[in-house]
Regions:
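Compositionally biased Ser/Thr/Gly- and acidic/asparagine-rich
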Residues: 1-278
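C-terminal outer-membrane/trafficking sorting elements
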Residues: 213, 266-309
């Protein structure tokens, strides 16, 4: 087994898997960046292309904020029995020791860099540091998002819409995340973009609306609610505005033509760099994360100017 590479084990019956690890070697991990290469896998369908299964290379917890990687990652939730998408720019999330995740390789990104600063002894997020870095990000890039949750009993799934006037509404692995469906009793929610089902849907969304789709595992009552709303969204049920949280009853199966999110469309461009950002020639990724250099391929902002590598 190799650090940074994800592995899936299949068993024919319930059992416990034990892997022998040399403790002495694990205790000698150097405090250096760990680069995990992302492979290209061609497909006629862009949503199926270049999927990689990546593993936390450290035998400890790891705060994804310190990954030099801005695109969404998709993680299996053991407790909620569903796939969840997270991004270092927008979420607080800590990987478990050796935990693996799915990611689509963005066109201009060749690797994920795990910086040693993300290593932790537990899952606790340093909220004071997080608040400061989020405040810094908000000065660099103006993006607004909403997280919508679908719940039945004690199972919840979520989808995200991000309004970014500089982003294309076409699918882009740098910003968007394909919805990975789970059929283990948890209701599934996603946004619909043409023929695509998305867990994260980032774009200009100039028409001010996004269609919601769902998979309902049983005839039951379900609730739609907003977890995080920077857009002031409204929910339409067959075109009629309803108040959230909103509970409805429905039969088992897919439901892609009933619910719509509406919001005020953006009127100005974004990616506004803070006026004091050039004091130390600070370099930022397109989503506002500060990085040390432009060594890797991508789009950067420095001294109010975009740099394309």
């Amino acid at each position: 087994l190799y650090p940074g590479k994800g592995y899936i084990f299949q068993a024919s019956l319930d059992c416990t898997l034990s892997i022998k690890i040399e403790k002495n070697e694990f205790g000698k991990l150097p405090k250096v960046d760990v680069d995990t290469k992302l492979d290209i896998h061609t497909s006629t369908n862009e949503q199926n292309a270049s999927w990689n299964f990546v593993g936390n290379p450290y035998p400890c917890f790891y705060d994804i904020y310190h990954m030099d990687f801005a695109a969404p990652i998709t993680v299996w939730s053991i407790s909620n029995r569903t796939y969840s998408a997270y991004s270092a720019a927008d979420d607080e999330f800590v990987l478990m020791p050796l935990q693996a995740f799915f990611v689509q390789k963005p066109e201009l990104v060749d690797a994920i860099t795990f910086q040693p600063a993300g290593r932790q002894i537990n899952k606790t997020i340093d909220h004071s540091a997080l608040a400061m870095r989020r405040a810094a990000r908000s000065k660099q890039v103006q993006r607004k998002l909403v997280d919508v949750a679908l719940t039945c009993a004690d199972r919840t799934d979520r989808t995200r819409v991000v309004v970014n006037a500089n982003a294309s509404d076409d699918f882009c692995a740098d910003n968007d995340a394909v919805k990975m469906m789970a059929y283990e009793g948890t209701p599934q929610i996603y946004t619909i973009a043409g023929a695509d089902q998305l867990a994260v849907n980032e774009g200009a969304h100039c028409d001010g609306s996004v269609a919601l789709g769902m998979y309902l595992p049983a005839d039951d009552a379900y609730t739609i609610a907003v977890d995080r709303d920077e857009l002031g969204v409204k929910l339409l049920d067959y075109g009629v505005e309803v108040e959230m949280p909103y509970t409805f009853s429905a039969a088992e199966g897919y439901m892609d033509d009933r619910f719509t999110l509406t919001f005020e469309a953006p009127t100005t461009g974004i990616n506004i760099v803070a006026t004091d950002a050039d004091a130390d020639n600070a370099i930022y990724t397109i989503d506002g994360r500060r990085v040390n250099s432009t060594a890797k391929k991508g789009i950067y902002i420095q001294n109010h100017k975009k740099i394309v590598k």
